[in-house]
């Protein structure tokens, strides 16, 4: 095995060991020393690859995004209508993260954008932007005529809508998270209709308010 390959294998082993420990003991309780021991490396080696548990979680998110992207491509290719494609993008993520639902629930406490583990943080920016690109593509390929003020913001709005669904799913106690799937189905229809109606003159004041709100949130 070449040195770069061995280094990548060690990094992956530490990441996998950490995720197992986070599942078993919780993110807050697990220590870097325990992670190193579980991975079979020295504590210093664990810190060489990841300077903190936060860095490990960001690496987990990054790996998940890379693994999800071909699945998201398939999801878009498998549907033709806007609602179906929007729903498919979300359902692919729910399916992928199902084994990690407990871990995501623990990490959901860190939603403050100032926290590095927040999906809204600067540290998560690259992962977030890669995901937003799929919503950009969804809108572009739908050929829905969008108002000039709303169009550039809409991919980010759809991404935030998706994050709301995922947060609901994390805490959904219904059997098989049935309520989430119902929410996704019904809300995708509503979102689609609102987007198609957004250019109507009568909705201009409401649209302006939405645009200003999103601009405030995103800075």
Task: Give a label for each model feature.
Residues 145-156, 171-175:
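Short acidic, glycine/proline-enriched loop segments that cap or flank alpha-helices
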Residues 117-143, 152-164, 182, 188-193:
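Amphipathic alpha-helical packing segments from all-alpha helical-bundle domains
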Residues 2, 13, 21-59, 63:
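Helix-turn-helix
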Residues 75, 79, 107-115, 142, ...:
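Secondary-structure edge/capping motif, primarily at the C-terminal ends of alpha-helices
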Residues 59, 73-106, 118-121, 125-127:
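Hydrophobic alpha-helical connector segments
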Residues 17-21, 96:
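Short amphipathic alpha-helical elements of helix-turn-helix/winged-helix folds
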């Amino acid at each position: 095995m070449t040195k770069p390959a061995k280094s990548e294998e060690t990094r992956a082993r530490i990441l996998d060991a950490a995720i197992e420990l986070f599942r078993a003991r919780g993110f807050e309780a697990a220590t870097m020393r325990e992670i190193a021991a579980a991975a079979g490396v020295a504590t210093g080696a664990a810190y060489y690859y990841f300077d903190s548990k936060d860095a490990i979680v960001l690496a987990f998110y990054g790996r998940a995004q890379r693994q999800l992207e071909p699945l998201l491509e398939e999801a878009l290719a498998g549907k033709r209508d806007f609602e179906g494609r929007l729903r498919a993008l979300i359902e692919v993520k729910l399916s992928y993260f199902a084994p990690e639902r407990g871990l995501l629930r623990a990490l959901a406490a860190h939603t403050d954008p100032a926290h590095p583990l927040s999906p809204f943080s600067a540290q998560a920016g690259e992962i977030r932007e890669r995901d937003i690109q799929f919503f950009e593509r969804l809108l572009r390929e739908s050929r829905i005529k969008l108002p000039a003020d709303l169009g550039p913001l809409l991919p980010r709005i759809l991404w935030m809508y998706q994050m709301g669904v995922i947060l609901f799913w994390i805490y959904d106690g219904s059997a098989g998270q049935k309520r989430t799937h119902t929410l996704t189905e019904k809300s995708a229809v509503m979102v689609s209709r609102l987007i198609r109606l957004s250019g109507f003159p009568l909705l201009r004041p409401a649209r302006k308010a939405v645009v200003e709100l999103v601009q405030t949130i995103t800075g």
